[in-house]
Curated annotation (Swiss-Prot):
Residues of the signal peptide: 1-26
GO cellular component: extracellular space; interleukin-6 receptor complex
Species this chain originates from: Oryctolagus cuniculus
Protein name: Interleukin-6
GO BP of this protein: acute-phase response; glucose homeostasis; hepatocyte proliferation; interleukin-6-mediated signaling pathway; liver regeneration; positive regulation of multicellular organismal process; positive regulation of receptor signaling pathway via JAK-STAT; positive regulation of receptor signaling pathway via STAT
Gene: IL6
Pfam families reported in the protein's UniProt record: IL6
GO molecular function: cytokine activity; growth factor activity; interleukin-6 receptor binding
Disulfide bond positions: 72-78, 101-111
Amino acid sequence: MNSFTSALRPGPLGCSLALLLVVATAFPTSAPVREDSNTKASPDKTLTPPGRTIESIRSILETIKELRKEMCDHDVNCMNRKEALAEVNLHLPRLIEEDGCFPPAVNNETCLLRITSGLMEFRMYLEHLQAKFRSDEENTRVSMVLKNIQHLIKTLRPKVKNLNEEATLKPAVAVSLMENLQQKNQWLKTTTIHFILRGLTNFLEFTLRAVDLMECGCPCLRNFMGSASHGQNTPSCPLDT
């Protein structure tokens, strides 16, 4: 044992060789990684790194923002004309306190179920919006939003229990939507599209906050509860369970 130790002492060369041996055994070589990726072909990519979901939501929000600007020729008043949007008789998904996404009643399972089912409903609305825009660029953007929403659903679905895979629009809702989108009146058609895109924006913004809280974990929740309680004892963190 002493002779082996003394053999490594003469100068920095021995230390360098020892370090190289440790590094070589600690990390896999490039060949097996390539072989594994070729054989398994990463089927579902369900192991989403932390933060990837948040990046995806932000990207979708930015695409929707640009799409609405193009539809209104960058007229802010057009994008936020509430009195016009109020005339659209559609009840879009939204997150409320009972969905368990925010303090004080945080419930991850309930929240993820509501987020995923809401996204699936918005996906059906987006499918009806295909090829309903004035320009090819706008149609391309809404197709991109739909594709990214589908990917987001695929990412969240493995984490959700009791999800209804057969979600469909209610017949009355589907009829009302199609009537608005097939109107010769371009104003009503455009207003309906804006209404759906704004509803999706609001839903995604709340989803972003909820997912951010889940990924941050208890430090964020305790900070939130601490500031809300004004010095009172904060409850145990629901995200610990």
